[in-house]
From Swiss-Prot:
Superkingdom classification of source: Bacteria
Protein's organism: Chromohalobacter salexigens (strain ATCC BAA-138 / DSM 3043 / CIP 106854 / NCIMB 13768 / 1H11)
UniProt remark on cofactor binding: Binds 1 iron-sulfur cluster per subunit.
Function (record text): Required for insertion of 4Fe-4S clusters for at least IspG.
Name under which the protein is recorded: Iron-sulfur cluster insertion protein ErpA
Gene: erpA
GO molecular-function term, one example from the UniProt record: 4 iron, 4 sulfur cluster binding
């Protein structure tokens, strides 16, 4: 093999269900500029944990992922752990929540809120 190979990371995805729920939450807040901030921090039973928050500002190093009018923002450090992930919204017996399907996770805890790489 000759020459350098280029690497383009797989993008992140925001499902239609997550986009619809995010749109409803933004409408409830009355601020159409709000975005869902998704981030990774140390902690949880598997080493890293996911976090969700509203953001009305976007940093220079942030990545924006859109689905229709819904937007999610990920900082550069978190993005490296979330490349290729899908953010979804589910409702069930345990309640309603945003979830992350992360192909980079080598293990997850039972509740799905923390992971290891």
């Amino acid at each position: 093999m000759s020459g350098a190979e280029s690497f383009v990371p797989a993008p992140m995805y925001l499902t239609d269900a997550a986009a619809q729920r995010l749109g409803a939450l933004v409408e409830e807040e009355g601020n159409p500029g709000l975005k869902l901030r998704v981030y990774v921090t140390g902690g949880g039973c598997s080493g890293f944990q996911y976090g969700f928050d509203f953001a009305d500002t976007v940093g220079d190093e942030d990545t924006i992922i859109e689905n229709g009018t819904a937007s999610m923002v990920v900082d550069a450090l978190s993005y490296q752990y979330l490349v290729g992930s899908t953010v979804d919204f589910e409702e069930g017996l345990a309640g309603a929540r945003f979830i992350i399907k992360n192909p980079n996770a080598t293990s997850t805890c039972g509740c799905g809120a923390s992971f290891a790489v």
